[in-house]
Amino acid sequence: MSLTVQTEQRGDMVVVSVAGELDMATAPQLQDQISDLLEKGRTRLVFDLAEVSFCDSTGLSVFVRAKNSTDDAGGTVRLAAPQRGVLRILEVSGLVEVLHTYPTVDEAVTASEPALD
């Protein structure tokens, strides 16, 4: 399955909407988009995961790298609206504690740090 990635500026945040399966084959596509955003100084990112049907460890590593990069630049990474299976992977891996996760994109965009579990 393919992956689609779209971005939208919302205030000082960039919403990165991801759809499809995020795995070893598709993670580089998302990583390239993130790298482009960071090069443009966009360091406040919300990943809309509502349409991500699957995420493996390669996909998780993309979010961890994004968090490390944005933290170094004084920014933030927030995850929004993960489907049950993706949320479960975040919980089992312990990343739900590290990657701020919100039930909706609107909550992720408007929330102050830290996030809800």
Describe these PLM feature segments:
Residues L3-D32:
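STAS-typified acidic loop motif
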Residues H100-T104:
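Short acidic-hydrophobic, aromatic-tinged amphipathic segments that line or gate anion-handling sites
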Residues L22-L99:
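Amphipathic alpha-helical interaction surfaces in cytosolic regulatory modules
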Residues R10-G11, A50, D106:
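Conserved catalytic submotifs in the C-terminal HATPase_c
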Residues T110-D117:
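Intrinsically disordered or compositionally simple regulatory linkers and C-terminal tails
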Residues S2-T4, D12, G74, V98-L99:
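A generic structural signal for alpha->beta connector loops
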Residues A27, V105-D106:
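Residues at or immediately preceding the N-termini of alpha-helices
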Residues R84, D106-E107:
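Acidic phosphotransfer microenvironment of two-component signaling modules
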